[in-house]
């Protein structure tokens, strides 16, 4: 990407002028951002992401960050000599793995993100779904995609029962940027590991967000030939599920994105987190990036 310092002043002014209509349009609106993939592990992309989030806040939007941490969890499990297992894109989470998930997400990844936002000039507060009773969950009953009579036991993986967004709204009103780890709690105060894409999608719905933006390690949703699909409807997504084009970790991502679109989130985007400032390009310019999910 071109170094901003090398751009001529007139071109910089034109870029800012192009962003102005979007800044006006989205002023005061909530943007839920799922932060994951390479954008979380590359230092330059980490700094870019933090700067982008702070900029959105400074121009009057309300960014809410929900983060993943799969690679970091996998590294921690490897150090313990424990092998990670996935079923239909969900991490199998026994009691020991749940302890690792909580420690890595809330104690390591979340705090790194909060620190980066502070370095970029913003104010962030880290939360888990336990804080403020935000995310109530129950054990996920996972039915096999190909044989509905088969149910997989994925341990302490959670299915969201309800989200209370009051703590998030309070932080937004006080000029903070919420950074949320996808951990919920059950009736017996047990912890649940919840897919971050699902949390972001449900939270966007509850907050009546203007946009849900999911950062990934791909240009967006790809067909079987590797071509980018820029616009997908519910019917098209069902067909991609059926023929196996969408599989693995993309399953919960696309399902959650579609649920959010059906529930009234105005725009749902799956974009390439490996592209510097891709989030700003999606939100503040007329240049479309990645895949847009529509309910119809």
Curated annotation (Swiss-Prot):
<dbReference type="GO" id="GO:0005737">
    <property type="term" value="C:cytoplasm"/>
</dbReference>
<dbReference type="GO" id="GO:0005524">
    <property type="term" value="F:ATP binding"/>
</dbReference>
<feature type="site" description="Transition state stabilizer">
    <location>
        <position position="34"/>
    </location>
</feature>
<dbReference type="InterPro" id="IPR001048">
    <property type="entry name" value="Asp/Glu/Uridylate_kinase"/>
</dbReference>
<dbReference type="InterPro" id="IPR041727">
    <property type="entry name" value="NAGK-C"/>
</dbReference>
<keyword id="KW-0808">Transferase</keyword>
<dbReference type="GO" id="GO:0003991">
    <property type="term" value="F:acetylglutamate kinase activity"/>
</dbReference>
<keyword id="KW-0067">ATP-binding</keyword>
<dbReference type="InterPro" id="IPR037528">
    <property type="entry name" value="ArgB"/>
</dbReference>
<keyword id="KW-0418">Kinase</keyword>
<protein>
    <recommendedName>
        <fullName>Acetylglutamate kinase</fullName>
        <ecNumber>2.7.2.8</ecNumber>
    </recommendedName>
</protein>
<keyword id="KW-0963">Cytoplasm</keyword>
<dbReference type="GO" id="GO:0006526">
    <property type="term" value="P:L-arginine biosynthetic process"/>
</dbReference>
<comment type="similarity">
    <text>Belongs to the acetylglutamate kinase family. ArgB subfamily.</text>
</comment>
<keyword id="KW-0547">Nucleotide-binding</keyword>
<dbReference type="InterPro" id="IPR004662">
    <property type="entry name" value="AcgluKinase_fam"/>
</dbReference>
<feature type="binding site">
    <location>
        <position position="193"/>
    </location>
    <ligand>
        <name>substrate</name>
    </ligand>
</feature>
<comment type="function">
    <text>Catalyzes the ATP-dependent phosphorylation of N-acetyl-L-glutamate.</text>
</comment>
<keyword id="KW-0028">Amino-acid biosynthesis</keyword>
<comment type="pathway">
    <text>Amino-acid biosynthesis; L-arginine biosynthesis; N(2)-acetyl-L-ornithine from L-glutamate: step 2/4.</text>
</comment>
<dbReference type="Pfam" id="PF00696">
    <property type="entry name" value="AA_kinase"/>
</dbReference>
<feature type="site" description="Transition state stabilizer">
    <location>
        <position position="253"/>
    </location>
</feature>
<dbReference type="InterPro" id="IPR001057">
    <property type="entry name" value="Glu/AcGlu_kinase"/>
</dbReference>
<feature type="binding site">
    <location>
        <position position="91"/>
    </location>
    <ligand>
        <name>substrate</name>
    </ligand>
</feature>
<dbReference type="GO" id="GO:0042450">
    <property type="term" value="P:arginine biosynthetic process via ornithine"/>
</dbReference>
<feature type="binding site">
    <location>
        <begin position="69"/>
        <end position="70"/>
    </location>
    <ligand>
        <name>substrate</name>
    </ligand>
</feature>
<dbReference type="InterPro" id="IPR036393">
    <property type="entry name" value="AceGlu_kinase-like_sf"/>
</dbReference>
<keyword id="KW-0055">Arginine biosynthesis</keyword>
């Amino acid at each position: 990407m071109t170094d901003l310092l090398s751009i001529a002043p007139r071109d910089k002014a034109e870029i800012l002028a192009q962003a102005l209509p979007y800044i006006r349009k989205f002023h005061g609106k909530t943007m839920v951002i799922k932060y994951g993939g390479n954008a979380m592990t590359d230092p330059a992309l980490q700094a870019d992401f933090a700067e982008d989030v702070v900029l959105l806040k400074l121009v009057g939007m309300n960014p809410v960050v929900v983060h993943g941490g799969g690679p970091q969890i996998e590294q921690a499990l490897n150090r313990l000599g424990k092998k990670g297992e996935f079923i239909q894109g969900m991490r199998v989470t026994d009691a020991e793995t749940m302890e690792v998930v909580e420690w890595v997400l809330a104690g390591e990844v979340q705090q790194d993100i909060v620190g980066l936002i502070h370095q970029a000039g913003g104010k962030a507060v880290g939360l888990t779904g336990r804080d403020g009773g935000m995310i109530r969950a129950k054990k996920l009953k996972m039915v096999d995609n190909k044989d509905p009579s088969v149910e997989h036991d994925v341990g302490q993986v959670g299915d969201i029962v309800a989200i209370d967004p009051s703590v998030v709204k309070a932080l937004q009103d006080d000029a903070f940027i919420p950074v949320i780890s996808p951990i919920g709690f059950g009736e017996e105060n047990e912890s649940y590991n919840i897919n971050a894409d699902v949390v972001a999608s449900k939270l966007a719905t509850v907050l009546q967000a203007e946009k849900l933006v999911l950062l990934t390690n791909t240009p967006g949703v790809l067909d079987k030939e590797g071509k980018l699909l820029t616009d997908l409807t519910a019917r098209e997504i069902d067909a991609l599920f059926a023929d196996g084009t969408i599989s693995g970790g993309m399953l919960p991502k696309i399902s959650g994105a579609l649920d959010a679109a059906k529930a009234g989130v105005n725009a749902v985007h799956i974009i390439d987190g490996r592209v510097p400032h891709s989030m700003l390009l999606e939100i503040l310019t007329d240049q479309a990036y990645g895949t847009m999910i529509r309910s119809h």
